[in-house]
Amino acid sequence: MRKLAYLLLGALTLALADSHALAQSADTPAPQPYTRIANPDTNVVQLQIALRKFVPIQNTGPTIWLASVMHVGELAYYQALQHFLDAQTVVLYEGINPDAHPHHVHDPLPAAPPAGTNGDYSMQSALARSLGLVFQLDAIDYDRTNFLNSDLSVLQIQNIMAEGRPLVANGGTNAPFDVLLQIMDGSSFLGSIFKIGLQFIADSPQLQAVAKLTLIEAVGRLKGDLSDVQGLPPDWKKLIQVLIQARNQNLMTDLSAELKKIPPSGSIAVFYGTGHMDDLEKRVTSNLHYHTTEDIWLPAFSVDLQKSGITPAEAQWMQKLVQGQMDQMQRR
């Protein structure tokens, strides 16, 4: 029974993790991972996220930081991120609804509320609470003069997914993107199931620890570019390509423009989820002719196995379970 609960938790956390990909393109050298699993103590398992520095190959131009982020973490993690971001000349940040923030690189298309939106609920915020963590949007102060939103709007993504077809009356496309939105805002049946599962985790300290350990193992072990994953239905593969590649292309346009505005001694931080970084690094190195010089690793969150009542045998079993799931997805 206990292992069945672990399996359910594994499926839940794998479904909700914003992480690296499941397969790697064969013709492009793979960047180094932006996540890793560390053991700062004998009984502690920790997820660490990288901030990676890039400088021009010709040594003339501003510094670029690919500041990858985990969307749920400990408060101290986001405090360290805030301190780092506040020190940069410009921060280009992720946010699919740019109109929700006061600073923009450019004016987006008017945002239309997607079908089934429940504005009072966020799956990622609920996930953070269930794990005893905090959600990125609740912990980072975006009201900074150097923070610029650089993302597509919901309507822009819906238009790309529709491929020229008219949108339905409520602004949606009847595509996987709308299904994903309804899961994330809890308005669909599957979203409701996730809500129940998250409450189940929140009510049990040991299951909470197991869920955090599963998330650490899943995010820490996934590598590569998410848009290269094999075996997905065409609609879902297109959705992933839009969510990663189309948004990254939009970001690169803004990044190129901002590089021309700030002095060579300045710096630009690209503040996006870890799943974007593999593709972004390839674009920064090949299109802008930058190369990496250093990494700063920040601990997102940890699990103390001993305090959580997880035995070494159970931890090893969970690690093998997650690794087996990763291997199956990569084979697909």
Regions from the language model: what does each represent?
Residues 1-4:
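Positively charged n-region of N-terminal signal peptides that target proteins for export
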Residues 6-17:
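Bacterial N-terminal signal peptides
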Residues 17, 21-25:
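Boundary at the C-terminal end of the N-terminal hydrophobic targeting segment
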Residues 51-60, 253-264:
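A short acidic-Thr-Gly-centered motif at the start of a beta-strand
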Residues 78, 82-85, 249-252, 256, ...:
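Extracytoplasmic/secreted envelope proteins and their assembly/folding machinery
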Residues 237-261:
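Portal/gating segments that form or line small-molecule/metal binding sites
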Residues 256-259, 265-305:
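C-terminal soluble interaction/assembly domains
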